[in-house]
């Protein structure tokens, strides 16, 4: 694999840092402004070089579809988890507001525990949770569950799941994933050149995504808790 120039490494680091901080990649214009690259053509030249050298994948139709490859993660210090990473793009996230020992979790629409449906990214409500249960992580948000594919894990229709935004998941984690632009809740398993999204309802079949389709699949976060209203 060809070595990176200092400038290419700088661009790659900026992309990775923006994904880590914001949950989605920067635009070409944002890269240029941050790194003082005067033209979008100049930024594109660096992106093409990173792609050609195997450090970046991107979708030319989508301005934010810039995904560091496993090789890039090794260069940037994330090689230990590289094989377990599904490409990640934008995910809803609203900062938590501490209120004594309570934090407010924003509820950002709905997600399917059944057939994938599009999650609506708007704040519908907030719930207050003791920080002892979820900590004070500012990258936690809530989604309202529809469907019954995760009833074996105690996630029922109408429940609210708490989701920690992050770039990776481990085998067996319950995740919110975007598959072909629709969101769903499933357990994730990495199986060689494919990823299996497994429901816990035995009446429902898993969803398989092969490596060639990773571009249209992304992890939006890992489920860290469930909230249920009674009465």
UniProtKB/Swiss-Prot annotation:
EC number(s) for this protein?
Answer: 3.4.21.88
Matching entries from SUPFAM superfamilies are given as:
LexA/Signal peptidase, Winged helix' DNA-binding domain
> Catalytic activity annotated for this protein?
Hydrolysis of Ala-|-Gly bond in repressor LexA
Active site residues per record: 149 (for autocatalytic cleavage activity), 186 (for autocatalytic cleavage activity)
Pinpoint the site Cleavage: 113-114
Q: Keywords for this entry?
A: Autocatalytic cleavage, DNA damage, DNA repair, DNA replication, DNA-binding, Hydrolase, Repressor, SOS response, Transcription, Transcription regulation
Q: What does this protein do?
A: Represses a number of genes involved in the response to DNA damage (SOS response), including recA and lexA. In the presence of single-stranded DNA, RecA interacts with LexA causing an autocatalytic cleavage which disrupts the DNA-binding part of LexA, leading to derepression of the SOS regulon and eventually DNA repair.
Write down what this protein is called. LexA repressor
